[in-house]
């Protein structure tokens, strides 16, 4: 006669449920053959939330403890150390009424954060599709700490919009990876001209200015911490 195999033993590690007045427990609950054996009185697998900290509260507490650990080193770029950093801005001429406003927002932001005019170079290309290859060339030149990529793609009656928008995004990403220099994506992809104008100095702000802030932080991060 074949002997019956004993049912598997599963080990469940509790991650979120714990009592408010108890410390984090390292105990586990074992399930064997369909019956559970609780190894600690401090654990509960009840569906009731009464008397227990929420999973989000537990996660927040654990994350806070991790962040406060003295041995952890946190590194970030600075927005107050723009002096000496050099930037290239690749701008698409297509939809120029929008891209000029984005460019103005970027340059004004650079000046606000102490980047000198002589450390900013603007390169115009026909459209957003052509941005990637130029950005990669500029990144590899070794002259710039970051490259801004500015354009505006607005949906029309055909699928041309999707092709250009996707190609522009992948082109900028490839330029950044292949050159090792931050190439910042500042190409608007909008449903209509109103959306584009709202994002180039209108009620939704100026995305060119936001792109410049990203470029400043990334350039500072690479220059001062990642060399």
UniProtKB/Swiss-Prot annotation:
Molecular function via GO: 6,7-dimethyl-8-ribityllumazine synthase activity; identical protein binding
Entry keyword annotation includes Transit peptide: yes
GO cellular component: chloroplast; chloroplast stroma; riboflavin synthase complex
Main location: plastid
Positions with a binding annotation for (2S)-2-hydroxy-3-oxobutyl phosphate: 157-158, 199
UniProt xrefs under SUPFAM superfamilies: Lumazine synthase
Similarity remark: Belongs to the DMRL synthase family.
Record text on subunit structure and interactions: Oligomer forming an icosahedral capsid.
Protein name: 6,7-dimethyl-8-ribityllumazine synthase, chloroplastic
Origin species: Arabidopsis thaliana
Lineage: Eukaryota, Viridiplantae, Streptophyta, Embryophyta, Tracheophyta
């Amino acid at each position: 006669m074949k002997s019956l195999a004993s049912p598997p033993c599963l080990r469940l590690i509790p991650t979120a449920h714990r009592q408010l007045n108890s410390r984090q427990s390292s105990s586990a609950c074992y399930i064997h053959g369909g019956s559970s054996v609780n190894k600690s009185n401090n654990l509960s697998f009840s569906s009731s939330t009464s008397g227990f900290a929420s999973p989000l509260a537990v996660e927040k507490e654990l994350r806070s403890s991790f962040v406060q650990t003295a041995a952890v080193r946190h590194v970030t770029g600075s927005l107050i150390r723009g002096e000496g950093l050099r930037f290239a801005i690749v701008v698409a001429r297509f939809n120029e009424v929008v891209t000029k406003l984005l460019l103005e927002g970027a340059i004004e932001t650079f000046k606000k954060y102490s980047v000198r005019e002589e450390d900013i170079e603007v390169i115009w290309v026909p459209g957003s599709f052509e941005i990637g290859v130029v950005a990669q060339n500029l990144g590899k030149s070794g002259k710039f700490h970051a490259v801004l990529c500015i354009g505006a793609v607005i949906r029309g009656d055909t699928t041309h919009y999707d092709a250009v928008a996707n190609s522009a995004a992948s082109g900028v990403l490839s330029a950044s990876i292949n050159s090792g220099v931050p190439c910042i994506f500042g190409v608007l992809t909008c449903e209509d001209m109103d959306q584009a104008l709202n994002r180039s100095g209108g009620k939704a702000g100026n995305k060119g200015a936001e792109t410049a802030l990203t470029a400043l932080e990334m350039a500072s991060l690479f220059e001062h911490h990642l060399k």
